[in-house]
Amino acid sequence: MAYIAVPAVVDSRSSEAIGLLESFGVDAGADANDVSYQDHDYVLDQLQYMLDGYEAGDVIDALVHKNWLHHSVYCLLPPKSQLLEYWKSNPSAIPDNVDRRLRKRLMLKKDLRKDDEYNQLARAFKISDVYAPLISSTTSPMTMIQNLNRGEIVYTTTDRVIGARILLYAPRKYYASTLSFTMTKCIIPFGKEVGRVPHSRFNVGTFPSIATPKCFVMSGVDIESIPNEFIKLFYQRVKSVHANILNDISPQIVSDMINRKRLRVHTPSDRRAAQLMHLPYHVKRGASHVDVYKVDVVDMLFEVVDVADGLRNVSRKLTMHTVPVCILEMLGIEIADYCIRQEDGMLTDWFLLLTMLSDGLTDRRTHCQYLMNPSSVPPDVILNISITGFINRHTIDVMPDIYDFVKPIGAVLPKGSFKSTIMRVLDSISILGIQIMPRAHVVDSDEVGEQMEPTFEQAVMEIYKGIAGVDSLDDLIKWVLNSDLIPHDDRLGQLFQAFLPLAKDLLAPMARKFYDNSMSEGRLLTFAHADSELLNANYFGHLLRLKIPYITEVNLMIRKNREGGELFQLVLSYLYKMYATSAQPKWFGSLLRLLICPWLHMEKLIGEADPASTSAEIGWHIPREQLMQDGWCGCEDGFIPYVSIRAPRLVIEELMEKNWGQYHAQVIVTDQLVVGEPRRVSAKAVIKGNHLPVKLVSRFACFTLTAKYEMRLSCGHSTGRGAAYSARLAFRSDLA
């Protein structure tokens, strides 16, 4: 059975249900036995009655958990005195678990009003001792619904309930005036048989449910045009709070299901509907619906080539794992010989990018992991390579489940990980008019220590001199490291014991303020040396502990002009590694592939298509009326981009229909103009409630993983005053 929710109420006849479906564009050429309607008119009365004593949101949030395919009913008990009177008149109705002394008295054929023992037993009697679970006037709406979903009969002492009809336990005379006159549609008289949920292939009802198996909501419904205010209120709340867990279904799919045709699937929601119903379907998906986060990768085989006296010698055979095919195509890499060093001995950008995008190297002779020496000085230095082949082509998902929400990203890399070089390369990559990773969108944890006076590294240096009992930095280095630059374990342990309170008392408080401020300025990529740095600073973004296929300590030694020199940086590197947690690191390539590969895939898909029809933005919307109150010109509404999107036109049109306004933030618009074009002012945003789920954006669209919060100004008027606003997400596209 499938349950289809449509925002309307009709009589509970199959002909009316079919007519209702046809009004939504469904071709319901089916027999009456195939489609039935659950008349939820009584629920509207209950909803109106409940809103007098409960918050609307609580009632609706409870009702959306009702399983409409499960038969259940409330059984309304009379007041205690009337219940005992009914039992006295009908001894056979007395439950078995009633106190035997009370039962014995009730079965006496005499007036009990002056019977002292009976009166004492009646006063001690509690209805809740006999009927459990029992709904009362203090029961929450969610508890009512949970009890309905668990059983078929739920006893209640109040008619202020929601989600099922009310069956009278006794004749109406025993209830006197306790029943609401507005609830007549809900009441089933005593002795009348309760109708069960019809077993049809398709049940049509008014209210969506996240507890009903195979529940679908008719897509394309204009909520604002719903005539019934209570149904409109329900759908507004459901679309705002529960939109991501409800299943939309198109009239086309409903038509095919009713007419027993093979389903013609056009959209992801239709495909999910077919899968939930376990029905075969034709995939009618064009080039517009391609999962751009599925990326083809290969393992690249290459040899380290040494040339001496005109003779070619292969000193090592290596495999570079999980190299994206799109990157190889972009760089024009093929089977050939390459020099991977620049004139100054540094690695070329293309080779550095290729290795960073991979999942490491393996020596084909020893089958062990191989870490490259970044130095150009022997031994074990690589100058020239010969690419000999590509094997093991397969597809990977570069957007795993850990990226559940659109949030900042914290990337933890050890010192000497080429962060500056990689960010310079990424800053230069622009695809479809979008900068992949602007340098302005990157924050380094070193900035926290550099804001101190003295800096964190200077403070550490002076304290360590005292521990070692030396006056100079050179003597400190000699005290910690042996001649092979390997630290003495006991002495490094002493330094680490001093490092912990410094990190806790000096670094962490400053880091909390720093990250609170930086994360309000945008969704930024934050680099740190140890994950403990971010954890102790209450960092709330995605936290990734990463590694690279290079010997980072060697890279530290060839970097000049660093605080304290190369050897002191090496000591700090050891300390940060001790400071990190025991979480297993992933390859840096797992993040870089997510940053670059989907965009290259999308570039192939939309090619030369009109950018106006393939571009969109999701951002915080501020009505111009609110801005004008703070001195802004009001030429247009305020809009602070949160996510920039590139996708085929059909995907953009689908995204336009989603409910973005359910996500909101406290936005501060400043009067500080940002240097550059277009004209804009900086802003801050603190998200309230849930973050934007990644799956809402769609796997068929590319979106920016970082953003800097700025409000664009389309005119040359003077800026207004800085102020805070409550803003909701809005979708902007030239197609709207």
Curated annotation (Swiss-Prot):
High-level lineage: Viruses, Riboviria, Orthornavirae, Duplornaviricota, Resentoviricetes
Main location: virion
GO cellular component: host cell cytoplasm; host cytoskeleton; viral capsid
Cofactor annotation: a divalent metal cation
Protein's job: Minor inner capsid (core) component. Displays NTPase and RNA 5'-triphosphatase (RTPase) activities. ATP is the preferred substrate for hydrolysis. May function as a cofactor of polymerase lambda-3. Associates with microtubules and plays a role in the formation, structural organization and morphology of viral inclusions, where the assembly of cores and the replication of viral RNA occur. Together with mu-NS, recruits the other core proteins to these inclusions.
Keywords assigned: Capsid protein, Host cytoplasm, Host cytoskeleton, Host-virus interaction, Inhibition of host innate immune response by virus, Inhibition of host interferon signaling pathway by virus, Inhibition of host IRF9 by virus, Interferon antiviral system evasion, Viral immunoevasion, Virion
Keyword Hydrolase annotated: no
Subcellular location as annotated: Virion; Host cytoplasm, Host cytoskeleton
GO biological process annotation, one example: symbiont-mediated suppression of host type I interferon-mediated signaling pathway
Molecular function GO terms recorded: structural molecule activity
Pfam families: Reovirus_Mu2 (PF07781)
Superkingdom of source: Viruses
InterPro entries: Reovirus_Mu2
Protein name as catalogued: Microtubule-associated protein mu-2
Impact after mutating P208S: Loss of filamentous subcellular location
Family of the protein in this entry: Belongs to the orthoreovirus mu-2 protein family.
Subunit structure as annotated in this protein's UniProt entry: Interacts with protein mu-NS; in viral inclusions. Interacts with polymerase lambda-3; this interaction stimulates the ATPase activity of mu-2.
